[in-house]
Curated annotation (Swiss-Prot):
Note, other: Both phosphorylation and phosphorolysis are carried out by the same active site and suggest a common mechanism for both reactions.
Region annotation (Important for the catalytic mechanism of dephosphorylation) ranges: 268-273
Superkingdom: Bacteria
Cystine residue pairs: none
Protein name in the entry: HPr kinase/phosphorylase
Native organism: Lactobacillus acidophilus (strain ATCC 700396 / NCK56 / N2 / NCFM)
UniProt-listed PANTHER family: HPR KINASE_PHOSPHORYLASE, PROTEIN YJDM-RELATED
Record note on quaternary structure: Homohexamer.
Length: 322
Protein backbone atom coordinates (compact mmCIF):
# COMPACT_ATOMS: atom_id res chain seq x y z
CA UNK A 1 0.00 0.00 0.00
CA UNK A 2 1.26 3.47 -0.86
CA UNK A 3 0.89 5.81 2.13
CA UNK A 4 0.89 8.86 -0.10
CA UNK A 5 0.59 10.09 -3.65
CA UNK A 6 2.71 13.00 -4.77
CA UNK A 7 0.72 15.83 -6.29
CA UNK A 8 3.27 16.03 -9.10
CA UNK A 9 2.57 12.37 -9.92
CA UNK A 10 -1.19 12.94 -9.98
CA UNK A 11 -0.75 15.89 -12.35
CA UNK A 12 1.64 13.97 -14.60
CA UNK A 13 -0.64 10.93 -14.86
CA UNK A 14 -3.66 13.12 -15.62
CA UNK A 15 -1.97 15.81 -17.70
CA UNK A 16 -4.59 15.55 -20.44
CA UNK A 17 -7.26 16.93 -18.10
CA UNK A 18 -5.30 18.86 -15.45
CA UNK A 19 -3.21 22.02 -15.64
CA UNK A 20 -1.36 24.00 -13.00
CA UNK A 21 -2.99 27.43 -12.94
CA UNK A 22 -0.87 28.84 -10.12
CA UNK A 23 1.85 27.71 -7.73
CA UNK A 24 3.96 25.41 -9.91
CA UNK A 25 6.85 25.93 -7.50
CA UNK A 26 4.83 24.36 -4.66
CA UNK A 27 3.71 21.21 -6.51
CA UNK A 28 6.70 18.98 -5.66
CA UNK A 29 6.28 19.57 -1.93
CA UNK A 30 2.63 18.55 -1.80
CA UNK A 31 1.42 15.00 -1.03
CA UNK A 32 -2.03 13.43 -0.89
CA UNK A 33 -2.91 10.92 1.84
CA UNK A 34 -6.65 10.31 1.28
CA UNK A 35 -8.59 9.36 -1.83
CA UNK A 36 -11.69 11.45 -1.18
CA UNK A 37 -12.22 14.73 -3.02
CA UNK A 38 -14.00 17.51 -1.13
CA UNK A 39 -16.34 20.20 -2.41
CA UNK A 40 -16.44 22.97 0.22
CA UNK A 41 -20.01 24.08 0.76
CA UNK A 42 -20.69 24.95 4.37
CA UNK A 43 -17.18 26.35 4.61
CA UNK A 44 -18.19 29.14 2.23
CA UNK A 45 -20.79 30.15 4.84
CA UNK A 46 -18.13 30.24 7.54
CA UNK A 47 -18.73 26.83 9.16
CA UNK A 48 -15.36 25.04 9.52
CA UNK A 49 -15.96 22.63 12.43
CA UNK A 50 -15.55 19.52 10.26
CA UNK A 51 -13.48 20.90 7.40
CA UNK A 52 -11.36 18.05 5.87
CA UNK A 53 -8.33 20.16 4.99
CA UNK A 54 -6.21 17.16 3.95
CA UNK A 55 -8.35 16.50 0.86
CA UNK A 56 -8.15 18.06 -2.59
CA UNK A 57 -10.53 21.03 -2.49
CA UNK A 58 -12.70 21.00 -5.63
CA UNK A 59 -14.66 24.11 -6.56
CA UNK A 60 -17.22 23.91 -9.33
CA UNK A 61 -19.90 26.14 -10.75
CA UNK A 62 -21.99 26.04 -7.57
CA UNK A 63 -19.12 26.98 -5.25
CA UNK A 64 -17.70 29.68 -7.52
CA UNK A 65 -21.09 31.31 -8.18
CA UNK A 66 -21.94 31.29 -4.46
CA UNK A 67 -18.56 32.79 -3.55
CA UNK A 68 -19.14 35.57 -6.10
CA UNK A 69 -22.20 36.71 -4.08
CA UNK A 70 -20.18 37.15 -0.90
CA UNK A 71 -18.60 40.40 0.17
CA UNK A 72 -14.90 40.80 -0.50
CA UNK A 73 -14.04 40.61 3.21
CA UNK A 74 -16.04 37.42 3.69
CA UNK A 75 -14.48 35.77 0.62
CA UNK A 76 -11.04 36.67 1.88
CA UNK A 77 -11.86 35.23 5.31
CA UNK A 78 -13.27 31.88 4.13
CA UNK A 79 -10.60 31.26 1.48
CA UNK A 80 -7.85 32.12 3.97
CA UNK A 81 -9.27 29.58 6.45
CA UNK A 82 -9.54 26.96 3.68
CA UNK A 83 -5.88 27.41 2.71
CA UNK A 84 -4.14 25.36 5.43
CA UNK A 85 -0.76 23.64 5.51
CA UNK A 86 -2.52 20.28 5.17
CA UNK A 87 -4.36 21.26 1.98
CA UNK A 88 -2.68 19.60 -1.04
CA UNK A 89 -4.26 21.84 -3.68
CA UNK A 90 -7.32 23.66 -4.92
CA UNK A 91 -8.95 22.47 -8.14
CA UNK A 92 -11.27 24.58 -10.30
CA UNK A 93 -13.52 22.73 -12.74
CA UNK A 94 -15.06 23.82 -16.08
CA UNK A 95 -12.16 26.28 -16.62
CA UNK A 96 -14.02 28.73 -14.39
CA UNK A 97 -12.33 31.98 -13.35
CA UNK A 98 -10.35 31.74 -10.11
CA UNK A 99 -11.54 34.21 -7.45
CA UNK A 100 -8.86 36.78 -6.67
CA UNK A 101 -9.23 36.15 -2.94
CA UNK A 102 -8.61 32.42 -3.43
CA UNK A 103 -5.55 33.11 -5.55
CA UNK A 104 -4.09 35.39 -2.86
CA UNK A 105 -4.88 32.97 -0.01
CA UNK A 106 -3.34 30.02 -1.87
CA UNK A 107 -0.22 32.02 -2.69
CA UNK A 108 0.29 33.03 0.93
CA UNK A 109 -0.12 29.40 2.09
CA UNK A 110 2.09 27.95 -0.71
CA UNK A 111 -0.78 25.89 -2.13
CA UNK A 112 -1.02 25.16 -5.88
CA UNK A 113 -4.23 25.86 -7.79
CA UNK A 114 -5.12 23.41 -10.54
CA UNK A 115 -7.73 23.84 -13.24
CA UNK A 116 -9.59 21.54 -15.59
CA UNK A 117 -12.10 21.97 -18.40
CA UNK A 118 -13.99 18.87 -17.24
CA UNK A 119 -17.24 18.96 -15.29
CA UNK A 120 -17.10 18.87 -11.50
CA UNK A 121 -18.73 15.45 -11.15
CA UNK A 122 -16.56 13.88 -13.84
CA UNK A 123 -13.22 15.15 -12.54
CA UNK A 124 -14.20 14.14 -9.01
CA UNK A 125 -14.92 10.55 -10.05
CA UNK A 126 -11.76 10.30 -12.17
CA UNK A 127 -9.44 11.55 -9.43
CA UNK A 128 -11.18 9.55 -6.70
CA UNK A 129 -10.74 6.33 -8.66
CA UNK A 130 -7.11 7.23 -9.42
CA UNK A 131 -6.29 7.90 -5.78
CA UNK A 132 -8.14 4.83 -4.49
CA UNK A 133 -6.14 2.60 -6.80
CA UNK A 134 -2.83 4.04 -5.63
CA UNK A 135 -3.62 4.32 -1.93
CA UNK A 136 -5.32 0.92 -1.63
CA UNK A 137 -3.74 -1.82 0.48
CA UNK A 138 -2.01 -4.36 -1.76
CA UNK A 139 -1.39 -8.08 -1.35
CA UNK A 140 0.63 -10.43 -3.54
CA UNK A 141 -0.57 -13.75 -4.99
CA UNK A 142 1.51 -16.43 -6.69
CA UNK A 143 -0.07 -16.96 -10.09
CA UNK A 144 -0.55 -15.58 -13.58
CA UNK A 145 -3.17 -12.98 -14.49
CA UNK A 146 -4.50 -12.81 -18.04
CA UNK A 147 -7.42 -11.07 -19.72
CA UNK A 148 -9.58 -13.37 -21.86
CA UNK A 149 -12.07 -11.58 -24.09
CA UNK A 150 -12.10 -8.63 -21.71
CA UNK A 151 -12.46 -10.73 -18.54
CA UNK A 152 -9.69 -10.96 -15.95
CA UNK A 153 -8.75 -14.58 -15.20
CA UNK A 154 -6.26 -15.52 -12.48
CA UNK A 155 -4.39 -18.79 -13.08
CA UNK A 156 -3.22 -20.48 -9.89
CA UNK A 157 -1.70 -23.83 -9.03
CA UNK A 158 1.40 -25.51 -7.67
CA UNK A 159 4.81 -24.51 -8.97
CA UNK A 160 5.62 -26.34 -12.21
CA UNK A 161 2.02 -27.12 -13.15
CA UNK A 162 2.36 -24.99 -16.29
CA UNK A 163 0.75 -21.64 -15.47
CA UNK A 164 3.21 -19.51 -17.45
CA UNK A 165 3.24 -21.86 -20.45
CA UNK A 166 -0.55 -21.87 -20.47
CA UNK A 167 -0.64 -18.07 -20.30
CA UNK A 168 1.82 -17.91 -23.20
CA UNK A 169 -0.51 -20.10 -25.24
CA UNK A 170 -3.41 -17.78 -24.41
CA UNK A 171 -1.37 -14.76 -25.52
CA UNK A 172 -0.69 -16.53 -28.82
CA UNK A 173 -4.46 -16.96 -29.18
CA UNK A 174 -4.97 -13.19 -28.94
CA UNK A 175 -5.52 -12.67 -25.22
CA UNK A 176 -3.60 -10.34 -22.92
CA UNK A 177 -1.00 -10.85 -20.20
CA UNK A 178 -1.34 -8.74 -17.06
CA UNK A 179 1.15 -10.35 -14.67
CA UNK A 180 3.28 -13.48 -14.48
CA UNK A 181 4.51 -15.28 -11.34
CA UNK A 182 3.50 -12.53 -8.89
CA UNK A 183 0.21 -10.67 -9.02
CA UNK A 184 -0.35 -7.61 -6.85
CA UNK A 185 -4.04 -7.32 -5.91
CA UNK A 186 -6.11 -4.64 -4.22
CA UNK A 187 -9.78 -4.08 -3.46
CA UNK A 188 -11.19 -1.37 -5.68
CA UNK A 189 -14.63 -1.38 -4.09
CA UNK A 190 -16.90 -3.69 -2.09
CA UNK A 191 -17.22 -6.33 -4.83
CA UNK A 192 -14.24 -5.64 -7.09
CA UNK A 193 -10.64 -6.87 -6.90
CA UNK A 194 -8.03 -5.56 -9.33
CA UNK A 195 -4.75 -7.26 -10.19
CA UNK A 196 -1.57 -5.83 -11.69
CA UNK A 197 2.09 -6.70 -12.14
CA UNK A 198 4.86 -5.32 -9.95
CA UNK A 199 6.69 -2.59 -11.85
CA UNK A 200 9.88 -4.66 -12.17
CA UNK A 201 7.99 -7.63 -13.69
CA UNK A 202 5.67 -5.70 -16.01
CA UNK A 203 5.23 -7.37 -19.46
CA UNK A 204 7.74 -10.10 -18.55
CA UNK A 205 7.29 -13.89 -18.38
CA UNK A 206 9.54 -16.71 -17.20
CA UNK A 207 9.37 -19.81 -19.39
CA UNK A 208 11.31 -22.88 -18.25
CA UNK A 209 13.95 -23.78 -20.81
CA UNK A 210 13.88 -20.33 -22.41
CA UNK A 211 14.20 -17.86 -19.55
CA UNK A 212 12.77 -14.35 -19.33
CA UNK A 213 10.82 -13.05 -22.33
CA UNK A 214 9.32 -9.62 -22.99
CA UNK A 215 5.75 -10.27 -24.13
CA UNK A 216 5.14 -6.74 -25.42
CA UNK A 217 8.34 -6.82 -27.47
CA UNK A 218 7.53 -10.24 -28.98
CA UNK A 219 3.76 -9.97 -29.48
CA UNK A 220 3.07 -6.24 -29.56
CA UNK A 221 1.39 -3.71 -27.28
CA UNK A 222 -2.00 -5.38 -27.75
CA UNK A 223 -0.76 -8.50 -25.96
CA UNK A 224 -0.32 -6.79 -22.58
CA UNK A 225 -2.29 -4.64 -20.18
CA UNK A 226 -1.32 -2.87 -16.97
CA UNK A 227 -4.21 -4.09 -14.78
CA UNK A 228 -7.61 -5.75 -14.87
CA UNK A 229 -10.48 -6.73 -12.62
CA UNK A 230 -10.20 -10.35 -11.43
CA UNK A 231 -13.53 -12.00 -12.23
CA UNK A 232 -12.59 -15.69 -12.30
CA UNK A 233 -9.92 -17.90 -10.71
CA UNK A 234 -8.83 -21.03 -12.58
CA UNK A 235 -6.84 -23.41 -10.40
CA UNK A 236 -4.66 -25.84 -12.37
CA UNK A 237 -4.08 -29.19 -10.64
CA UNK A 238 -2.04 -32.20 -11.73
CA UNK A 239 -4.23 -35.01 -13.05
CA UNK A 240 -4.96 -37.72 -10.49
CA UNK A 241 -6.67 -40.82 -11.98
CA UNK A 242 -8.09 -41.66 -8.55
CA UNK A 243 -9.64 -38.24 -8.02
CA UNK A 244 -13.34 -37.61 -8.58
CA UNK A 245 -13.49 -34.51 -10.78
CA UNK A 246 -16.65 -32.52 -11.39
CA UNK A 247 -17.97 -33.61 -14.79
CA UNK A 248 -21.25 -31.69 -14.92
CA UNK A 249 -20.35 -28.35 -13.38
CA UNK A 250 -22.68 -28.46 -10.37
CA UNK A 251 -19.91 -27.63 -7.89
CA UNK A 252 -19.49 -23.89 -7.35
CA UNK A 253 -16.22 -23.01 -5.63
CA UNK A 254 -14.88 -19.60 -4.66
CA UNK A 255 -11.61 -18.13 -3.48
CA UNK A 256 -11.37 -15.18 -1.14
CA UNK A 257 -9.11 -12.39 -2.39
CA UNK A 258 -8.96 -9.12 -0.46
CA UNK A 259 -12.18 -10.03 1.39
CA UNK A 260 -14.05 -10.59 -1.89
CA UNK A 261 -15.29 -14.05 -2.92
CA UNK A 262 -14.18 -14.78 -6.52
CA UNK A 263 -15.63 -17.79 -8.43
CA UNK A 264 -13.05 -20.57 -8.91
CA UNK A 265 -12.88 -23.45 -11.38
CA UNK A 266 -10.49 -26.38 -10.83
CA UNK A 267 -9.04 -27.79 -14.06
CA UNK A 268 -6.94 -30.99 -14.03
CA UNK A 269 -3.83 -30.89 -16.21
CA UNK A 270 -2.38 -33.88 -18.06
CA UNK A 271 -0.53 -34.57 -21.30
CA UNK A 272 -2.80 -34.34 -24.32
CA UNK A 273 -5.32 -31.87 -22.89
CA UNK A 274 -5.43 -28.51 -24.67
CA UNK A 275 -5.50 -26.41 -21.52
CA UNK A 276 -5.55 -23.07 -23.35
CA UNK A 277 -8.80 -23.91 -25.15
CA UNK A 278 -10.33 -25.37 -21.98
CA UNK A 279 -9.53 -22.19 -20.05
CA UNK A 280 -10.88 -20.05 -22.89
CA UNK A 281 -14.14 -22.01 -22.89
CA UNK A 282 -14.33 -21.89 -19.07
CA UNK A 283 -14.10 -18.10 -19.21
CA UNK A 284 -16.77 -17.84 -21.92
CA UNK A 285 -19.03 -20.25 -20.03
CA UNK A 286 -18.64 -18.17 -16.87
CA UNK A 287 -19.60 -15.04 -18.79
CA UNK A 288 -22.65 -16.85 -20.22
CA UNK A 289 -23.73 -17.75 -16.66
CA UNK A 290 -23.43 -14.11 -15.61
CA UNK A 291 -25.67 -13.19 -18.54
CA UNK A 292 -28.28 -15.70 -17.36
CA UNK A 293 -27.54 -18.74 -19.54
CA UNK A 294 -26.44 -21.76 -17.49
CA UNK A 295 -25.94 -24.90 -19.60
CA UNK A 296 -25.62 -27.08 -16.48
CA UNK A 297 -28.90 -25.83 -15.06
CA UNK A 298 -30.59 -26.24 -18.44
CA UNK A 299 -29.36 -29.86 -18.63
CA UNK A 300 -30.60 -30.51 -15.10
CA UNK A 301 -34.03 -29.06 -15.92
CA UNK A 302 -34.29 -31.09 -19.13
CA UNK A 303 -33.26 -34.27 -17.32
CA UNK A 304 -35.81 -33.65 -14.57
CA UNK A 305 -38.55 -33.06 -17.13
CA UNK A 306 -37.56 -36.21 -19.04
CA UNK A 307 -37.65 -38.34 -15.89
CA UNK A 308 -40.99 -36.82 -14.94
CA UNK A 309 -42.45 -37.60 -18.38
CA UNK A 310 -41.21 -41.21 -18.29
CA UNK A 311 -42.58 -41.67 -14.78
CA UNK A 312 -45.96 -40.40 -15.92
CA UNK A 313 -45.93 -42.73 -18.95
CA UNK A 314 -45.06 -45.71 -16.74
CA UNK A 315 -47.85 -44.81 -14.32
CA UNK A 316 -50.39 -44.45 -17.13
CA UNK A 317 -49.28 -47.81 -18.61
CA UNK A 318 -49.70 -49.59 -15.26
CA UNK A 319 -53.16 -48.10 -14.79
CA UNK A 320 -54.13 -49.11 -18.35
CA UNK A 321 -52.95 -52.71 -17.78
CA UNK A 322 -55.02 -52.88 -14.61
Amino acid sequence: MADEVKLSKLIKDNKSILEVYQGQEYVNAKKIYVSDIYRPGLELTGYFDFYPAQRIQLLGRTEISYAARLDHEIRTHVFTKMATKATPCFLISRSLPVPEELSEAAEKANIPILRTSESTTYISSILTEYLRARLAKRNSIHGVLVEIKGMGVLLTGASGVGKSETALGLVQRGHRLIADDRVDVFQKDHNTVVGEAPKILRHLMEIRGIGIIDVMNLFGAGAVKSRTEIQLVINLVNWDPKANYDRLGFQENTREICNVEIPQVNIPVKVGRNIEIIIEVAAMNFRAKKMGYDATQMFDNNLTNLISEHSKEDTDKVQHDD
